[in-house]
Structure formats: C-alpha cells, structure tokens
Amino acid sequence: MLSKIAKLPILKRLIPSLAIRILKLIGKNRGYYSIRGINMYLDFLDPIDREIILFNEFENLEIEFLISEIKRKKLNYFLDVGANCGYYSLKIAQKISNINIFSFEPNPEAYHKFSKSLLKNFEFSNNIKLENFGLSNENKKLKMQSMIKFGYAQTGGSTVNEKSISEKHHEFFANFKIGDEYLNLSNNNLAIKIDVEGHELNVLHGLKKTLDSNKCILQIEIFNNNFKEVDNFLSYLGYNIFYVIKKRSNYFYSNFKIN
C-alpha cells in the first residue's frame, strides 16, 4: 500500500526530498530493508537504492521478463555484469533456486552493500559468486567516476572515464578483467545482464569466446550514442534483438531462436 501511495506524482517528488534531509540529519540513511522477501542493505541517498526502498522494485519489467525467459529456456547460468547493490542477482536467486550466478561489481561501495545483503540471505550464498572487479577487454585498473549528490558518491551510474568530468564527481580506480579468461564457459545456456554505463563494447570484446560458445540471452543497456557499434558487433556474432524496453534503453538479444 505504501509503495503505491509513494508513486503518486506529487508524493513521488516530495517524499524522497523530505526523507533524504531527515535521514541525513540523523545519520540513518543506510541499513537493512525487507524487499519482497529479500533483506537488502541499502542507502537512501543513492537514487537506485531509494527507488527500491520506496517502491519495492527496480526495473521490474526487465527483471520479470528475464526471469520468465530463464525459466522458459532452462538457462543454467546468470552473469550480472555491473551488479551494483545486487538487486538483479538476488531477485533471480530468489526465483530460480538451481541457477549459478556470477556477479561483477568494480565499485567498492556497491560491492560493500551487495556483500552485506548476501550475509543476510545465506540461502543464496551457494548460488551467487560475487566479485569486486568489472569486466572489460583487458586486465587492468581503470579510472571510474561516480556522481556526488547530498554529499554521497552514488553507486548507480558509475562510469569508466579516463578524463575528469567535474568536482561533482568522485574519482577512483577499480580492477577489471577479461571475462573469457575468468569464466571459461562453453556449451552452456546463459543469461547475461550488462549495465555498465557506456563500457558495453569493451565488456563484449572480453566475452567474445563466451558469447560464441554458449547459447545466450543477453540484456544490455545501450545508449543511443554507441548503439550502432554495439549492435553491429553483436550482429557479427550472430545475435538478434527479440525484445526492447525503450524507455530505459534495455535491449534483449539472443543467438538462438526465441519462440
């Protein structure tokens, strides 16, 4: 009921604004929240965390569609590339008990939140392998940036960017690895979610062998400025778009026939 009330247009703006000021003032902006049966460690100052707290969901259309395809196609691995606070990984572990999940998150603050959530959801510990590095086309440290708002460096939207943007961004270096070298998967059925804020092509180049040697459904966020490059690369590997959620730039590809 509260999540429905919070979605009313005027309250959708008013509630977060008031809550941010109060929680920051008393120093209680982070902690554990029960989100549809999952205990998640979240920070109200982070916009994605805040959406999960207020509405008990995030990218619900994408997650429900992805879960239905994993079940329908009997996929046995889920790769969460850009896992952030772990919402996708935890939801999929909750809904599909026998799936193997690899979660990759280079931002140390996001990794910290996800790790604390895993401690409170012990039943998923055998399903989820969480790594504190990102995927790319080379093994190296890369400079990342996060937007600072309300004095907090937001974990959602962290980008790989070698150039300094502004003083309103927090800069840090994070570890990245070539996905193919870490995973070494072949002849399996995979679901892959990639949400890496412009680093998509680098991730895909590092996963070329994995994408070639497995049946895959791929959910990838692609912004307009690099859509053509990413789409051309995936087309070259034999992947076709079969579903789109345009308002959030999320595209679903597969390299096998979707009925």
Whereabouts are the PLM-identified features?
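Phosphate/nucleotide-binding beta-alpha loop and adjacent structural elements of enzyme active sites
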Residues: M1-N259
